[in-house]
């Protein structure tokens, strides 16, 4: 159990997808203007990562890995296209659920919801799972933790950006300039977790 808690804490804080690897920055910067929208997208990314990492773990171990189907047959060259296909299917299902049951959030996320399919944070989580050779329970914990870490980062940035509306930001830094600086400072703060030995 201690191993899984360590993996979860590492995925959320030490190896944060947004602030340690800078993955998923397009939606991270574009949707972080309001906390409510950022939280909704964070939940969507967490759900997609929490489902797609274990689902792709099963596909990788049962179909793509060397010798999984037939001894001597290695289908790992199909990793990228297969992983993206599984992620796309999961995002489509999530999009239909949000459209049906949460139309306000669906409209607020707009084009960024289908773009979760090609969000490099999602693909990065799946790729790290395959590269680090996580087993199925580890992939569940890692997928959920990576999503929670990305959500924590985008909600924190949205909170900072909402506060900055009332700050006296120099004209040359308004908009994305101060957002990049804020993201960099947040990343520096999260680097302090790198010294934590888990």
Swiss-Prot record:
The UniProt entry lists membrane topology as: Multi-pass membrane protein
| Signal peptide positions (record) | none
Question: What domain of life does the native source organism fall in?
Answer: Bacteria
* Biological process per Gene Ontology, one example term: respiratory electron transport chain
Q: Does the keyword Acetylation apply?
A: no
The catalysed reaction is:
a ubiquinone + n Na(+)(in) + NADH + H(+) = a ubiquinol + n Na(+)(out) + NAD(+)
Task: Print the keywords alphabetically.
Answer: Cell inner membrane, Cell membrane, Ion transport, Membrane, NAD, Sodium, Sodium transport, Translocase, Transmembrane, Transmembrane helix, Transport, Ubiquinone
Please tell me whether the keyword Thylakoid is annotated for this protein.
no
Please tell me which top-level EC class this enzyme sits in. Answer: translocase
Instruction: Supply the Pfam families for this chain.
Output: Rnf-Nqr
The record's listing under InterPro entries reads: NqrDE/RnfAE, NqrDE/RnfAE_oxidrdctase, NqrE
Q: Mainly resides where?
A: membrane
Q: Which family does the entry's similarity section mention?
A: Belongs to the NqrDE/RnfAE family.
Put simply, this protein is called Na(+)-translocating NADH-quinone reductase subunit E
Organism whose genome encodes this protein:
Yersinia pestis (strain Pestoides F)
């Amino acid at each position: 159990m201690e191993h899984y808690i360590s993996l979860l804490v590492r995925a959320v804080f030490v190896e944060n997808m947004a602030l340690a690897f800078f993955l998923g920055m397009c939606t991270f910067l574009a949707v972080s203007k309001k906390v409510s929208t950022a939280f909704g997208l964070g939940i969507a990314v967490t759900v997609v990562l929490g489902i797609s990492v274990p689902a792709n773990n099963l596909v990788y171990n049962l179909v793509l890995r060397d010798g999984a189907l037939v001894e001597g047959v290695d289908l790992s060259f199909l990793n990228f296209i297969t992983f993206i296909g599984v992620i796309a299917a999961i995002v489509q299902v999530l999009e239909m659920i949000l459209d049906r049951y949460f139309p306000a959030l669906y409209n607020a996320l707009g084009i960024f919801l289908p773009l979760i399919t090609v969000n490099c944070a999602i693909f990065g989580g799946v790729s790290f799972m395959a590269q680090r050779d996580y087993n199925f329970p580890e992939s569940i914990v890692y997928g959920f933790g990576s999503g929670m870490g990305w959500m924590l980062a985008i909600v924190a940035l949205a909170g900072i950006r909402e506060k900055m509306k009332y700050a006296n930001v120099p004209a040359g830094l308004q908009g994305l300039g101060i957002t990049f600086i804020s993201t960099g400072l947040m990343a520096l703060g999260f680097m302090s977790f790198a010294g934590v030995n888990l």
